[in-house]
């Protein structure tokens, strides 16, 4: 490779070869594990990072426009058809150079960086929606990413964040979601839990998930509202939904459990609720 020169890739991509890990063109990808890469912190860089071919493809299909791509020869070649017309530079480097830039070895071999874009309101993301996931206190990025992946695969139309939730665009959340955090519409409630009342006034039935023994069993509760617009409320692992959220909900629902187990991982519980919704007749469309 010749450092800093543009080269014609055998598959037709115009790439810029980089051999120096200190090259300032790669600053958007530098030290990805550093605390200042946390975009949810006051001093954090507010960039969205996609890792791996599939997640980069989903970024390219989303509202997030890449500033640059950085990858190995092999992985950039896999993206050849997706990159037509993308007005961003492609930086090519060895796996060794990539590791020195980002701070760890990346098996997936390619990254894309994008700026954040303005977020829609709750009213905008739920307009026309039939099934909405409402999260409160879900502060683990991996759980959040898994919920987005489950939502995408099980026909959830939008996600609404209440208080105390993690950042859906943090790198780990985007990676675990397989890029679906970039595609599934979401919004943050400006006034919590008052926004739950707004959902009710918009015609949604609020089903609050809780392990309490006096709650309705999930399959029966979902079946009873199969023709209605529903919002599935999911709380933090451990404390669950707050008393205020439970009070506003229309129905409290629980997953029937066995062997003395009182609850499941929050992403697993959400997936079961989403699946019950599809099983009750809510349409599963073609995958992304």
From Swiss-Prot:
GO terms for biological process: methylation; RNA processing. The keyword Methyltransferase applies. It is an enzyme of class 2 (transferase). Residues 1-20 are annotated as: Disordered. Its EC number is 2.1.1.-. Residues 1-12 have a biased composition (Basic and acidic residues). Disulfide bonds: none annotated. Keywords: Methyltransferase, Transferase. GO terms for molecular function: RNA binding; RNA methyltransferase activity. Belongs to the class IV-like SAM-binding methyltransferase superfamily. RNA methyltransferase TrmH family. This is Uncharacterized tRNA/rRNA methyltransferase Mb0905. It comes from Mycobacterium bovis (strain ATCC BAA-935 / AF2122/97).
């Amino acid at each position: 490779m010749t450092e800093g020169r543009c080269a014609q890739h055998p598959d037709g991509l115009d790439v810029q070869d980089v051999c120096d890990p200190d090259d300032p063109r790669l600053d958007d990808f530098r030290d990805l594990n550093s605390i200042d890469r946390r975009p949810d912190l006051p001093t954090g860089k507010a960039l969205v990072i996609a890792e791996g071919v599939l997640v980069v493809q989903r970024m390219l299909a989303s509202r997030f426009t890449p500033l640059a791509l950085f990858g190995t020869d092999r992985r950039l070649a896999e993206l050849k058809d997706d990159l037509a017309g993308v007005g961003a530079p492609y930086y090519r480097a060895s796996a060794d150079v990539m590791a020195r830039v980002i701070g760890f070895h990346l098996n997936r071999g390619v990254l894309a960086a994008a700026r954040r874009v303005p977020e829609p309101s709750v009213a905008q993301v739920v307009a026309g929606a039939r099934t909405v996931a409402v999260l409160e206190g879900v502060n683990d990025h991996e759980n959040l990413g898994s919920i987005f992946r489950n939502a995408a695969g099980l026909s959830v139309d939008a996600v609404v964040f209440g208080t105390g939730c993690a950042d859906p665009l943090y790198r780990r959340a985007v990676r675990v979601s397989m890029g679906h955090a970039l595609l599934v519409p979401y919004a943050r409630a400006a006034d919590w839990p008052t926004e739950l009342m707004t959902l009710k006034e918009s015609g949604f039935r609020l089903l609050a998930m809780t392990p309490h023994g006096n709650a309705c069993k999930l399959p029966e509760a979902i079946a009873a509202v199969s023709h209605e617009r529903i919002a599935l409320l999911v709380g933090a692992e451990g404390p669950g939904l707050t008393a205020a959220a439970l009070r506003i909900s229309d129905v409290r629902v629980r997953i029937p459990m066995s062997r003395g187990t009182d609850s499941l991982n929050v992403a697993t519980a959400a997936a079961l609720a989403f699946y019950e919704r599809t099983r009750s007749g809510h349409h599963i469309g073609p995958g992304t």
